[in-house]
Amino acid sequence: MKLEESTMMVANTGLEEIIRNHKELTQFIFHKDDILFKENEHPVGIYCIESGSVKICKEESPGQERILHLAIAGEILGLHSVVNGHVYTNSAAAITETRVSFITASDFMELINDNNTYKLLVMKSLCSRIDSMEDHIVRISEKMSDERFADTLLVLIEKYGLNKSKELNIKLSIDELASYTCTSKSYMKKIITEFTHRGLVTYSGGSVKILNLPLLRTTALLNAGAAID
């Protein structure tokens, strides 16, 4: 993890702009797998992602995590725990090299306490995160594993995009794909093998290449038929 002094950045509208313009702002650089914060730790501050990506996850059992959300540039982390004054309810770890702007919990609370506009932005940011997580849960809750994976890939395409080689602009391990799809690692391997045989995707070294996007969309919408479970 590398620590840098605050620098001037292009400002966006909303809460992230307020954080970026704070005089005590600090920047951190987290490398892949570096931990921003852990579940049940007391919050130290607010993180605004400037570049890179972070997985928000919850421990289900020792060594077993469930990815709840994949956060990208412009998203704010740690807000709920800081505002409500309780421990982190989940953990955050970088999945790529990630640069964040950081403001301490005390500085942030001082910033918003006397400003109703800032309080409203906090509420909007919290609601947006909840909506995003709920949408992911709803989209996959009633699908079979192969449909869930197809839907997950569509979400990842929308979030990260594809490069010229039709590969996702994010590398994810089998474990991470399984966790975000809400299936087991063994099923995920079977699904990837099945999708490869069907000409939908290929997977190598963390990279997912999309071979047939229209068929992938069709698979995500299926409600019947053979499943891998």
Predicted feature locations:
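Short phosphate-coordinating micro-motif centered on Lys-Gly-acidic
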Residues: 35-41
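Cyclic nucleotide-binding regulatory module and flanking cytosolic helices
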Residues: 1-35, 76-77, 81-83
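Phosphate-/nucleic-acid-contacting segments
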Residues: 158-229
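Cyclic-nucleotide recognition modules
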Residues: 18, 23, 69-127, 131
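Short beta-strand segments in beta-sandwich/barrel cores
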Residues: 35, 53-58, 76, 99-100
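Polybasic "coupling" helices that flank or enter modular domains
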Residues: 113, 117-182
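A cytosolic small-molecule/anion-sensing beta-strand core signal
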Residues: 31-32, 50-51, 72, 96
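Glycine- and acidic-residue-biased ligand/ion/polar-headgroup-sensing regions
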Residues: 44-55, 73-74
